Amino acid sequence: MLTYETWEENDVSFSEEDETKGALSVLSWAYKEYENEIVYACSFGVEGMVLLHLINQVNPSAKVVFLDTNVHFQETYELIQKVRERFPSLNIIEKQPKLTLDEQAKLHGNKLWESNPNLCCKIRKILPLEESLANEKAWISGLRREQSETRKHTKFINQDHRFQSIKVCPLIHWTWKEVWRYVYKHSLPYNPLHDIGYPSIGCEKCTLPVGEGGDSRDGRWAGKVKTECGLHYQ
């Protein structure tokens, strides 16, 4: 089994005719390699809808973890319910932070997402994912190379130094148009915020719509240098 400690470069080839651009092949490899020791960390963005559909074909009872920061858009929570109805066999876990919002405010002040967004992300996303990955050998992410400069070198199979794990990224070669083409083709549910200018959807407090021609991550932590929550630093 390929683990963080036994890391060696791996790649997956795929034919030009493969509609999934290697995604199904990568997922098949991953679930064969790790069986029940792999989890998909899903934010329920549009890429997530594609991956959930693909994962359901490979392993209908796969584990899926959603990092519930308690400050997501209502539309996101409603989408999760639709996904549960569409893919009832998937094991969707809504992982909560150790601190409630009130407890966080007492310790660090109100609106920590404004005063110290890095700490807020650590408390409400990074630490919960660490806990979720503690008993796993690998995890799956919906990163695409096209999304931003920080993601353009992502590979199918990555040694993840942040969580000392293996990170599997099946959609690295997909474009934004291909993601949506797949969603429409298979009539997949998606977050309606995508229709009003939100290409990337995170917490409600830190996500704004993006103007035409903007980077898909421009709406995240707008006005700050921060462009990543910290889950995907290598």
Swiss-Prot record:
Binding-site list for [4Fe-4S] cluster: C120, C121, C203, C206
Active site per UniProt: C229 (nucleophile)
InterPro entries linked to this entry: APS_reductase, PAPS/APS_Rdtase, PAPS_reduct_dom, Rossmann-like_a/b/a_fold
Compartments (UniProt record): Cytoplasm
Pathway membership: Sulfur metabolism; hydrogen sulfide biosynthesis; sulfite from sulfate
The entry's keywords: Cytoplasm, Iron, Iron-sulfur, Metal-binding, Oxidoreductase
Cofactors: [4Fe-4S] cluster
Catalysed reaction, written as an equation: [thioredoxin]-disulfide + sulfite + AMP + 2 H(+) = adenosine 5'-phosphosulfate + [thioredoxin]-dithiol
PANTHER family listed in its UniProt record: PHOSPHOADENOSINE PHOSPHOSULFATE REDUCTASE
Name of the protein described by the UniProt record: Adenosine 5'-phosphosulfate reductase
Taxonomic classification: Bacteria, Bacillati, Bacillota, Bacilli, Bacillales
